[in-house]
Structures are given as C-alpha cells and as structure tokens.
UniProtKB/Swiss-Prot annotation:
Belongs to the RNA polymerase beta chain family. This is DNA-directed RNA polymerase subunit beta. The RNAP catalytic core consists of 2 alpha, 1 beta, 1 beta' and 1 omega subunit. When a sigma factor is associated with the core the holoenzyme is formed, which can initiate transcription. The gene is rpoB. InterPro entries: DNA-dir_RNA_pol_bsu_ext_1_sf (IPR042107), DNA-dir_RNA_pol_bsu_external_1 (IPR019462), DNA-dir_RNA_pol_su2 (IPR015712), DNA-dir_RNAP_su2_dom (IPR007120), DNA-dir_RNAP_su2_hyb_sf (IPR037033), RNA_pol_bsu_bac (IPR010243), RNA_pol_bsu_CS (IPR007121), RNA_pol_bsu_protrusion (IPR007644). Residues 1186-1210 are annotated as: Disordered. It comes from Clostridium novyi (strain NT). Residues 1200-1210 have a biased composition (Acidic residues). GO terms for biological process: DNA-templated transcription.
Length: 1241
C-alpha cells in the first residue's frame, strides 16, 4: 500500500511494491570513468605503441618515458573560458629520451605536447567557449563472426568474417560445390587451402593430418592448383599485389606485415578477449561425443572415454590441460575440433601474479617455453612480464587462424554456433577515452613520420628531442576531433534532463560506425539483449530511429566497452533470492534464466509461487522455481532516465511513450518551477547527477546564504567551503540558467546535499513543467486536432512564463581603408536613438530595447571619393572629422526585444585574446520574458502534444461545482486512438493527491494500480470514476455529461511561436536569381511555389499570377518602378522580364545553345543583357552592397537621360528606406544564400 519516502527535502507518498535492492549508479559515470581511464591507461598504451622511434640506420632512438598533465598551469577556469570563448585545457608535458648508439650519449627533455581539453565535473568539455559533449559510439566488436546463407536448393552455405580493430579482414565463404574460399582484405577469393599452405602446412597430407578428414576440405584441396608452401605464397602475393614481380621472400614479409605485425594489425584487448572466448575449444566440445579417449598430457589420466558425452566440467578440464585438438563423433563421421591454444594462466602457475594484471587467457606455447626454461618464482614472473606482448598478443597468431578455419569446418555438423551481429554481446561502446585515444594515436603516428625525417636530415651531434618533435600533428588531431567530429556535439542544454540524456546517449553513427542510408531494419530494431542495457523506448523519430539510443538506468560499461546490467543471484537449492548483485554482459546473461523484479517473495526472500515466469533469450517461459538463476534488481531497469520519469508508462503505447521521453528533453525552464504532483521518484537522482545543482562537498553547517553565494563551515577541519551560484547565464539553447539557494543559515548539511535549485528544479527534483487543473472536454472546436484551450490566468500569473537570453556581438576590425571604431558619434543618427548608449558607444545594462535599436555604435571608413570644392573647404577648416564613414552599428534584429542583462567588452589593450584583425569585441545579452501565447507548443509526459489555439478569459472557462475554473481543456478524442491511457490515470491520481496535499511517487512498472487510485479518490471525497459535473463559464449551465477532471503535469516546449513567426515587406534578394531569400534567419519571403502557380492557373487569375512572378519577385526594374508608382499614387506599370528567365537563357547559352525569344509574329525580342543602366538611373544599386541608394548620376552630361532622373524625386526618398538589395553578404552565413546550391537544406 502507499507509504511515505523521503526524497531530498520533500516527502513523497510512494506506491512502489518492490523495494530497491541496488542503488542506481552515478548517471554520468560513462563519461567521467572513460576520461579517467584515458589519463591513467589510455595515453600510456598509445605511447607504448609508438615506442621507440628509430631512424632508418637504427642509430638514433627516441623514447617517450613519462607524461603529466600540468593542472596548475590551467589558464582560465570553466566560467572564464565560457566568457572569453576559450578552451578549458591544461598543458600536456611529456618526458622524452634520445639515445645516440654510436656515441652512447643520452639526452632527456620535457617536451610540451600542446594544450589538452579537460573534462568538467559535469562530464562536458568547454571548446571555444561552448559546452560540448562527446557521445559514446556503438560499434561492432572485433572478433570472429559466423553466419550462413541458403542457396537455391535450400543448402546452408556457412561463411565467416574475422574482424580486427584495425588491419586486414579475413573472410571465409563456402560455395554450392562445397569449396571453401578465403578473401584477404576484401580482395578476390582464393581456395582456403592456399592460405593454410602459406602459413606453414605445405603438403596435402599435412593439411589433412592437421584438420582431419573433412569433405569440404578435401574438395577444396582438389580445386587448389598449388601443391607447396612456396607456390601458395606466390599465388597470394599475385592476388594482393598485382603487377609486382612475386618472390617468396616478399610474399612472406607481406603476410607477416599484414597479420603478425602489431603496428599494422591490432585486435585490441577486446578483440583478444572475444577471440579467446569464441575460439576456445571447450565451448565447441559441450554435449558432443568423444571419438577417442582424451588423455591429460601431464598426468596420463583419461579425462573422457571414447563414446562418452562431454559435459561442461570435462570440457573445461580439457581446455585447462592445454589440449588443443579433440576428435568428435558426429553420426558416422569423425570431426576434429581445434582450439586457438590459449589457456588460463592461473591453472599453470601456483603463486600469486595478481600484480601483473593478467585477466585474459595466454598463448600456451609461449607460456610452456617460459615454464620449461625457468623454475623459480622470481624469474618466471620476470619472464612473464618481459614477454607479456607474446603471451597476450594484440595481433592475430597462426593458432587463431587455424582455429577459425576449424570452426568453419565444424559448423555443418552443428559444432559451434552462429552469431547475431545485432546482439549487444557483439556490439561495444567506444566512449570519450577511447575515441580520444584513437585520435591521439593518429596524431602521434603522423608525428613519428616527421621525427624519422628530421633524424636523417639534422646534425647528429647537436640534435635534441625538442628539435625532433613537432607537436603540430598531435595538437591538430585533438583539435579536429573536439571541433568537428560527428561525435563531438554541441550540448543540448535546454533543461537538466536534456543535458543528462545527451551525456548518456549512444550513437551507432559516426566515423567507423554505420551511416543512416546503409543501416537496415535489423540494426535499428529492439533486440532481446537490450534488456537493462539500452532503452527500448527512447530513440529519435525520423531517419535516425534505432541508431541513436539511450543507456538504461542501471547499466554500466565494463573495461572492454560492453554494457552490463545488474541482477540478484538466486540460491537454486532453496529457491531463495539473495542480496548479492552481479553485473552481466549480454552474452553472459544468455546462459541463465532471469525472473522479473516483481515476482512475489516471502520474508526470507524465497519465491512464493511454484511456477515462475522467466526470460530465456528472446522467449518468455514458465519454469519451476528451482530452475531460476537470476532476478532483476528493479522494474525500471529496462528503461532510460527520461522514460523512467513517465508515470504509468506501463499503460501507454510504446510509440507515444517514445514521444513523451523525447519531448521532456525539449521542455523550457519556467520562471517558477513546480515538481510534479504525480512523479516516479527518479526526479531527484536525475537532477542531482545532471550537474546543474551545487552540492555540499563535505559535512558542515551553513554559515552564510545570499542569492549569489553559499558558505559552509566544514565539520572536519573548520575550514570554509564557498559555492558561487550562477545568475542569469545563457545556456547553449538560449534558455536561462539561474540558481537560487534552498538552504538557510545554521542548517546542517551532509556531503552531497543539494544547496541550491537550478533551472527546472524544485527542491532538488527535476521540475520541467507545471501541475495544471484540466479537463477532457471539447470547447467550440478549439480542441480540433489536439489543440489546447488555455485560461488567461496562465498568462496573468506567469505560470508558463520562461526567460530567454540571446547573445549579440559586434567586432571592430582593421579594414583596408583603416580601422573600424566603436563610438557614440554615428553619422545621420539622431540623439533620440542614442538615449540608451553610453559615452563608449555601447548600450547600458538595464536598458529596454526593441527591434532596430542600436546596441553597439560602430563606424567603418568608406572609400575616399572625388571631393567637390565645398567639401575640400570643409576638410581644410574642420580637419579629419568630416572624413567619410559608414554606419555599421549592431542593431537589435527584427522581431527581437528585451532587457539588456549583461555587456562584455574585450579589447587588445586589456590583454584579451582576440582573433587576428579584431581590435575590440563587444557582446550584449538581451533577456526577454516570454509568456505563453497562441501558437506555442505544449505537451504532457505521455506523448500528448498540442498547440495553443486560444487564450480564453478566466470567466469563460468551464468551472467546477466549487467555482474553480479549469486552466486547460484537452480534446478527449486524443486519448482512445493513441492508446496513451497513462495520462488519464495521471489525471485521476493527481486529482486525489492535489486535494490531499500529497506529492506522489509511482515508479514505472511498479506503480499504483487502478483500485488504489479509486480508493484514494474516495478518500479525497471524489467520485470513484474521477468525473465531475462541469459548468459552462459563459452561461453557467452544466454541460450534458460529467467530465474527467484532475491535475496533469504539462510542459511548455522549446518550439515557441516567437522564434518561428516573422513578416517581410521588402528585404534581401538572392544575387543570382534576384528572388527574395527564404527563412526567418535571412529575413526571407514566402515562396510562391510550383503548386501555388498551378492553383492560380486553374482559377484563370492571369494578371495576379503575372504580378506574383514578376514585380513581386525578380523583375528588378519592375520592382522599383512599382514601388515608385505606389509612392506617387500612379497606376502600376507593365511587368518586365524576370531575372530568373535571364538566368535560364544564360544557362542554356552556357550549354552552347543559341536561344532567342520570339514574339507572336516570330520577330526576335531583344532581352537586355544587364539592367544596370536602368538601375543607376533609378537610383538603385543592384550589386547588393550596403549602400542602398546610389547618388543620382551627377557626373553625367545633363542631356543624356533627363526623364529618367525626373522619376526619382530626392525629397520623397528622405523618409522611405528602400530595402531592395539590402543584402549584406558578410552578414549571411555563407555569402550566397542556401537556395543557390542544391543542398539538403
């Protein structure tokens, strides 16, 4: 039944039935742990890979000995980096030793290897002032994979791929004639016997002896035209290096460098682990019948007798006795099974070698060699340490290749298993640390080339490590990764949940991953191995569906990059669930039967029911209670954090739950956050781990609290901890980040307690929206198509008001004609426009600005023109002041307004780092309060989204019997077809809880049942169906039917109408077509497209159509003349020829086609090449520079075009600002606008 639980400072009444056994791990540990690993181990591995660098003679040797990150030399703190557009980084220093073999001279130096970006405590990076997140990548794990195709006759043709981390692939395939082929590194296929011969088994007899007499192998040997090792080597060389003269030596060295050279072929630790797991002999021996006695080579005992079935224990014993080949009886055939000769080192060494950190199996021949030659512990340990790379080779070895071939040969006899590449046991995570390591490796290998070149060129006497090493390639590789990699993303900072989700995101895209176009349905689909590891719900809609996923709540990533999930162990003898918790990867879990977390237990933890429902791979089956191996730790372990925040998720349709999870991430932080009445209990954990809340570092007592700072007196040593709070900072998405304290002076706090609320949090719980009193009722059609009818009270009381902060910057540069200047002295600007500008020329903080207001006054030198006599006189009298400058001030863009909350000025004089050519940089921050308005998008947590259609006066809204009006009316038709019934249960529970003053926690799959809600409704004094009589606010009459009413948690999403609506009369035009640009950012127009033209044609509205396609679009002369005619009140003149038509003619002429335009009477119509002359006469400049009006042509002889000059009466232009070609190219992102390129935009 319902019971109280304490979450932070708030008590919630919880409906959970299952007590949580396992605490949720830190939700951003994926990021933090991976980055830590990089500094502790990852970087070391890279240096080990390149050590030592030798010159071509082998005389000079360069070694990297040690490295350290100088955290004391960090230039700016995180906050300063954001302010100054800097990167939060620390210098990496590497100790380098140079050895000259001839002279025996050794030089050691510490070399600076560039600034390395540091991760903040929140798991983000600050790159060039912007917070970025490195998303983890899901990739195929290196290993050996087996599959099959079916040919026309229904016969299974087995194939296999051996995939390294980097290096040449080996692919085996069988054709319908039972011949096995191999492809080496994607080249043409060869019979597999050629590869076997080349690896050392030259003759047919040797091959058959080694692999056993197998039909397909014999057929392959017959097909093979080589008979010796030498012939095979030459054959392979011809295939891999066509056109080069083949020799046996070059063929040998080619194979060695392709497969057995650690620099060219890298399996990585994961690959070695997967190889040993797949190719180990014991897995294939399970449940097979031995064809002969298997004898322990050390003791001579018989492990398995002929004809005996091999069980798990016997199979393991065979493996641990280093027996690498066993004959198996399959019906009437004898099949030889060969392993890859790797063993568990602890079975052969009886003393402690834990300090060597050997977790993988080791290569037995190498180990045997050491054990045969040494006997005492110390020297064995030394040798193992020395030969660690031979014991655990990072490249493939001949034994591995033989084992992969043996596996392929055994598959038709059901020895071995087929792999599923979408199984999470075969997909792993590359997190920040590994991605960084790969980048660093690329940089270092480029640097290695430079070092080798310099070694040969420079004088060997005076050479130093510093002179050899060029850090450019390393620094460039790292910079490129953080700046432009697909996996380095601009952090989604809309609210704390979106931050958290972004850090826990898993992407299958990116370098070395899949591409959207190639990814099929299987990769995207939910797989049974996702259970407890990846969320089956949260993924984007659209082309990325299933390729971008989210980590489940309890999931962890192990050292190999596989995702693990926790389970409780079951004691099978007593059928008792213990409190012991194990973390399992997907392929380990496959061997067990797992019960669900809600399975009822008695007080001793034993199963109550005799029959238990369990998961077995993708099936759900019922077994007796003594067969269960494991039990889930929590019902919410299968979903991600965002999905776990949806109450009654179990009553929602999956596709709507997906929308609900995604839309919570788009909720805008509101002015007064309110935690949900009906929550799930995970809100606190999510907010605390997201990193937006300041937490106490130590136990202590609050000594001082203000709106900007909290100070804590530590209990341990009496010292003082100071926590600065963020005030009105702009997030990446333009929402407002503001923290306010929730502790008071004298309060005792424990380490980890929340000190202040941030954006969208309420008492340390995530609070994305508001609890709104609503009813499912239609109202005058304003609910059509999911629209929402809202009460004016939401506007008046600022319930859905949010603060948005925009940043505008202006820089004063050096131009060819002189430096730009930031000043208050702007030409042709009245004093009225400068009322908020200070003496420096910058707007004052606190000023209210509207669109078009000046933020930063700036003037740019103009080209010197021929001066008239009067001007020369003025120059002579007043000096330089009368020089030509142009007003290029920063103004508030169209449709923006607000209050200046901050201004930052960076100058060269103050020692700020500015880009080259920039002397001064000014940034203004404008904050605006956005109240809820018609057209804003709102949503619940169950995927029920809609747009506000009307804001109704409070007195007209439907009201309850006690007189309280509803705040929102939703359409009841939105529920049944969408099957998200969770929202109805939320409304009922919220109605009861709201009345009783409770906050509720109803965890997913573990929450309130229908009868519990009914009980609570009765307790609160409401009808048990949750419905009530509603009265019409306009007439006071009751509605015909009773209506479901209650409290629903509603979010305001980031799709605000203010950001989307805009209006244009005239504005910038595209340079080529002279048509208006498109989109709000370019201040564009509405495109009158193909279909709209058809519509006007269908109506026969010829003149309207002509006008739309000419003077309203790209008839340059006609545009101006029409404007004139409107201004002077005359009739609109005839349209001219559209510019796009001229462009079309030019394009046809570019194809060498002679195009003429003919009239009805077949006479050629001359189309003027350029309308520049007309334009100049009209006083319009079509080049699209910033000067809107060209001065009327005074330099011409007066008789030339008298009437053209008469057209333009200068005085009339004083008050009309023509904006035809206001196209300031430098202000558009890429110069020409997007329509000019056939891009995907």
């Amino acid at each position: 039944m319902v019971h109280p639980i304490q979450i932070g400072k708030r008590t919630r009444m919880s409906f959970s039935k299952v007590k949580e056994m396992c605490p949720m791990p830190n939700l951003i540990e994926v990021q933090l742990n991976s980055y830590d690993w990089f500094w502790k181990e990852g970087l070391n591995e890279v240096f080990d890979d390149v050590n030592p660098i030798q010159d071509y003679t082998g005389n000079l040797i360069l070694e990297f000995i040690d490295y350290n990150l100088d955290k004391d030399a960090i230039k700016y703190s995180v906050e300063e980096c954001k302010e100054r557009d800097a990167t939060y980084a620390a210098p990496l220093k590497v100790k380098v030793r140079l050895l000259n073999k001839e002279t025996g001279e050794v030089k050691e130096q510490e070399v600076f290897m560039g600034d390395f970006p540091l991760m903040t405590q929140q798991g983000t990076f600050v790159i060039n002032g912007a917070e970025r997140v490195i998303v983890s990548q899901l990739v195929r794990s290196p290993g050996a994979y087996y599959g099959y195709d079916v040919d026309k006759t229904g016969k299974k043709l087995f194939s296999s791929t051996v995939i390294p981390n980097r290096g040449a692939w080996l692919e085996y395939e069988t054709d319908s004639n039972d011949i096995i082929y191999v492809r080496i590194d994607k080249t043409r296929k060869l019979p597999i016997s050629i590869l076997i011969r080349a690896l050392g088994l030259g003759s047919d007899a040797e091959i058959v002896d080694w692999f056993g007499e197998e039909e397909r192998l014999k057929a392959t040997i017959e097909k093979d035209n080589t008979k010796t090792r030498e012939e095979a080597l030459l054959e392979i060389y011809k295939r891999l290096r066509p056109g080069e003269p083949p020799t046996v030596d070059s063929a040998l060295s080619l194979i060695n460098s392709l497969f057995f050279d650690a620099k060219r072929y890298d399996l990585s630790r994961v690959g070695r682990y997967k190889f040993n797991k797949k190719l180990a002999i014991y897995i294939r021996l399970l449940n097979q019948v031995a064809a002969e006695d298997v004898v322990n080579p050390f003791t001579g005992e018989i492990i398995v007798q002929k004809g005996e079935t091999i069980d798990r224990e016997k199979a393991l014993e065979i493996q641990n006795c280093a027996i690498n080949a066993v004959n198996i009886q399959v019906e009437d055939k004898v099949i030889k099974v060969i392993g890859n000769n790797f063993v568990d080192i602890h079975k052969f060494i009886d003393f402690d070698i834990s300090d060597l950190k050997i977790k993988e199996h080791v290569h037995y021949p190498t180990l045997k060699n050491i054990l045969d030659n040494y006997t005492d512990e110390k020297s064995i340990k030394e040798e193992i340490k020395k030969n660690i790379h031979e014991l655990i080779p990072k490249h493939i070895v001949v034994d591995d290749i033989y084992a992969t071939i043996s596996y392929e040969l055994g598959l038709p006899y059901e020895i071995g298993t087929i792999d599923d590449i979408d199984h999470l046991g075969n997909r792993r995570l590359r997190s920040v640390g590994e991605l960084l390591q790969n980048q660093f490796r690329i940089g270092l290998s480029r640097m290695e080339r430079v070092v080798k070149e310099r070694m040969t060129i420079q004088d060997q006497e005076v050479i130093t490590p510093q002179a050899l090493i060029n850090i450019r390639p390393v620094a460039a590789a790292i910079k490129e990764f953080f700046g432009s990699s697909q996996l380095s993303q601009f952090m989604d900072q809309t609210n704390p949940l979106s931050e958290l989700t972004h850090k826990r995101r898993l992407s299958a895209l990116g370098p070395g991953g899949l591409s959207r176009e190639r990814a099929g349905f299987e990769v995207r689909d939910v797989h049974h191995s996702h259970y407890g590891r990846m969320c089956p719900i949260e993924t984007p809609e659209g082309p990325n569906i299933g390729l971008i996923n989210s980590l489940a709540c309890y999931a962890k990533v192990n050292e190999y990059g596989f995702i693990e999930t926790p389970y409780r162990l079951v004691d099978k003898k007593e059928a008792r669930v213990t409190d012991e918790i194990v973390y399992l990867t997907a392929d380990e879990e496959d061997h067990y039967l797992v019960a669900q977390a809600k399975e009822p237990l008695d007080e001793n933890g034993c199963f109550i029911d005799e029959k238990i429902t369990v998961r077995d791979l993708e099936d759900v089956i019922v077994v007796s209670k003594d067969q269960v191996d494991l039990m889930d730790v929590s019902p919410s372990q299968i979903v991600s954090v965002a999905t776990a925040m949806i109450p009654f998720l179990e009553n929602d349709d999956a596709s709507r739950a997906l929308m609900g999870s995604n839309m919570q991430r788009q909720a805008v932080p509101l002015l007064k956050p309110a935690a949900p009445i009906v929550g799930t209990g995970i809100e606190y954990k999510a907010a605390v781990d997201s990193g937006v809340l300041p937490k106490a570092e130590h136990d202590g007592v609050i000594e001082y609290v203000s709106s900007t700072e909290v100070r804590i007196r530590r209990d341990s040593d009496g010292g003082l901890d100071k926590h600065k709070l963020l005030k009105y900072k702009r997030s990446n998405q333009g929402t407002c980040i503001n923290q306010r304290p929730i502790v008071s002076k004298g309060e005792k706090v424990k380490a980890g307690d929340v000190l202040a609320d941030g954006p969208s949090t309420d008492f340390g719980e995530i609070a994305l929206g508001q609890n709104i009193r609503m009813g499912f009722i239609t109202w005058e059609g304003y609910n059509y198509e999911d629209a929402m009818l809202v009460s004016e009270q939401l506007v008046r009381d600022d319930i859905f008001t949010s603060i948005h902060i925009e940043e505008y910057e202006s820089e004063a540069r050096d131009t060819k004609l002189g430096p730009e200047e930031i000043t208050r002295d702007i030409p042709n600007v009245g004093e009225d426009a400068l009322k908020n500008i200070d003496e420096r020329g910058i707007v004052r903080i606190g000023a209210e600005v509207r669109s078009g207001d000046i933020l930063v006054g700036k003037v740019t030198p103009k080209g010197e023109t021929e001066l008239t006599a009067e001007e020369r006189l003025l120059r002579a009298i007043f000096g330089e002041k009368a020089r030509e400058v142009r007003d290029t001030s920063l103004r508030v863009p169209h449709g923006e307004a607000g209050i200046i909350v901050d201004v930052k000025v960076f100058t060269r004089e103050n020692g700020d780092e500015l880009p080259p050519g920039v002397n001064e940089l000014v940034r203004c921050y404008i904050a605006q309060k956005r109240k809820i308005s018609v057209g804003d998008k709102m949503a619940g947590r169950h995927g029920n989204k809609g747009v506000i259609s009307r804001i109704l006066p409070e007195e007209d809204m439907p009201f309850l019997p006690d007189g309280r009006p509803l705040q929102i009316c939703l359409n009841p038709l939105g529920v049944p077809s969408r099957m998200n019934i969770g929202q109805v249960l939320e409304v009922h529970l919220g109605w009861a809880a709201g009345e009783m003053g409770w906050h509720i926690a109803t965890p997913v799959f573990n929450g309130a049942f229908e009868d519990e809600i009914v009980e609570l409704l009765q307790e609160a004094g409401y009808s048990e169906d949750g419905k009530t009589v509603l009265y019409d606010g306009r007439t006071g009459e009751p509605f015909d039917n009773r209506v479901t009413v209650g409290y629903m948690y509603i979010l305001k999403l980031h799709h605000l109408v203010d950001d989307k609506i805009h209006a244009r009369s005239t504005g910038p035009y595209s340079l080529v077509t002279q048509q208006p640009l498109g989109g709000k950012a370019q201040f564009g127009g509405q495109r009158f497209g193909e279909m709209e033209v058809w519509a006007l044609e269908a109506y026969g509205a010829a003149h309207t159509l002509q006008e739309v396609l000419t003077v309203k679009s790209d008839d340059v002369v006609g545009r101006v003349k029409t404007y004139e005619a409107i201004v002077k009140g005359e009739n609109i003149p005839e349209p001219g020829v559209p510019e796009s038509f001229k462009v079309l003619i030019k394009e046809l002429q570019a194809l060498c086609l002679d195009v003429k335009v003919l009239s009805d009477t077949n006479e050629e119509i001359k189309i003027k090449e350029s309308s520049e002359e007309d334009m100049e006469d009209l006083g319009v400049n079509i080049e699209g520079t910033e000067d809107e009006i060209v001065p009327t042509a005074e330099k011409r002889s007066s008789n030339q075009d008298e009437e053209a000059l008469e057209l333009v009466d200068n005085e009339e232009f004083e008050d009309i600002k023509l904006e035809y070609d206001d196209l300031q190219l430098d202000e558009l992102e890429n110069g020409l606008e997007l329509e000019d390129f056939n891009d995907e935009h």
